Amino acid sequence: GIRDDLVTGVQTCALPIFKKIIIFNYDSEKTEHPYISLETILNNNEMDETFEEFPFDHPIYILYSSGTTGYPKCIVHGAGNALIEQMKELILHCDVKENDKLFYFTSTGWMMWNWLIAGLACKASIYLYDGFPFYKNNDCLIKYCEDHQFTLFGVAAKYIDQLKKEKFDAKKYNLKNLKTITSTGSPLVKESFVYVYEKIKKDVHLGSISGGTDVVGVINICNPFNSIYAGEIQCPSLGIDVDVFDENGNSTKIDEKGELVIKKPFPSMPVMFWNDKTEDKILNAYFRKFKNIWHHGDYIQKTKNGGYIIYGRSDATLKPGGVRIGTSEIYRQVESFDEIQESIVIGQNYKNDVRIILFVKLSYQAKLDDELINKIKKKIRINCSPRHVPSKIISCPDIPRTKSNKIVEISVRKIINGEKVDNIEALANPNSLEFFRQLKIDD
């Protein structure tokens, strides 16, 4: 919630190819650097509209994956490839129309910013907020939505979960133009679907969506013409041949969990990986597990409603007794407790098997005593299964996360199992790992 002056930092980081840096809502007397104001540009009618033509797949974005599963991938995306995919998602799936107002709670380092920019091609206006979403009050973003009458309000699932936990009621705000809320970053649980319709807006299209930096877009997405089922993503994105495979590469039955795959090429596949002349990196990233099939790395289930439920990253799944358990199944139960602010769950190698270790970051003044531990275990046992119940529940001061706000189960798992963690520069709070390095878990 601390305000900071970024102008000097921008000047320091400016690349030689930058001709001008644009600022707005800033007192020009505070800086000696050569800037041009946004107002000056908007008031200038002398526009040079001569643009150089490039091939459809000419590189436009270099994006780095979040680093939750290892070193970040340096992914190059093509201009036309990304744009046609994103416009399809916005116009056909999210019902974006000319003169709409689109907002996404994202930093410029997350691919949702690139997705938001495509709104301009849909003749919509776009709005950005980069900062703490509860600055001063928990209504910060909702008030922003009201003030500008957004038609699409895009946020992370964790943001909705936190509003629900704080019992925030948005019904007093004027959100008359809001027609779509999209949620991404992690699975949106059933209870948060219910919360949105009860406490934010009852006649809104709530779309849980999932894709990634790898495709600079969405794979499973919302559909304004279909029914919404709490906890489910409505459908695959149009033109993307989504399926769920078992470990042997066979399609799973309805309601069986497996690996998210794409069986045919699609427009927004990466043009290449940077510094990958042999294409070994890109092939290893997506095509090694199943021959000629894109393996996305999500643990997922197709439902009888035609939708999908994502249970977490495939390589973060828990395997006690050899049975795969998605991490989101446990998070849904644990984070319903007011005493728990956030949690992270991993599998620890133990006596030729794997046991589940749950770490919890407590809410202010909450205490992890035997009573709370037993309540957590009981809820997990009743709503999931005895296999889901953690062997240990441990309080931790902070949850390690990437700069795009994704928790890093794999890094914590490696530390607990005595393995080296290489990619700490991808973390927003690398010092949080020190607690886990010093931890000794007894029997």
Question: Regions from the language model: what does each represent?
Answer:
Residues P236-S237, N250-F287, I325, K420:
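Conserved ATP/PPi-binding loop(s) of AMP-dependent carboxylate-activating enzymes
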Residues Q11, E146, F153, F266-P267, ...:
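AMP-binding/adenylate-forming catalytic core of the ANL superfamily
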Residues P72-C74, E85-E89, N114-W115, I142, ...:
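Adenylate-forming
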Residues G249, C396-V421:
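Flexible lysine-rich "adenylation lid" loop at the C-terminal edge of ANL adenylation domains
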Residues I22-I23, H33-I36, T40-Y64, Y71, ...:
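Conserved pre-ATP/AMP-binding loop-to-beta segment of ANL
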Residues G1-C13:
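Single conserved hydrophobic/aromatic residue that forms the stacking wall/gate
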Residues A124, F150-G154, K164-I228:
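Gly/Ser/Thr-rich phosphate-binding loop
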Residues L83-K101, M111-T151, E166-F168:
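Conserved AMP-binding/adenylation subdomain of ANL enzymes
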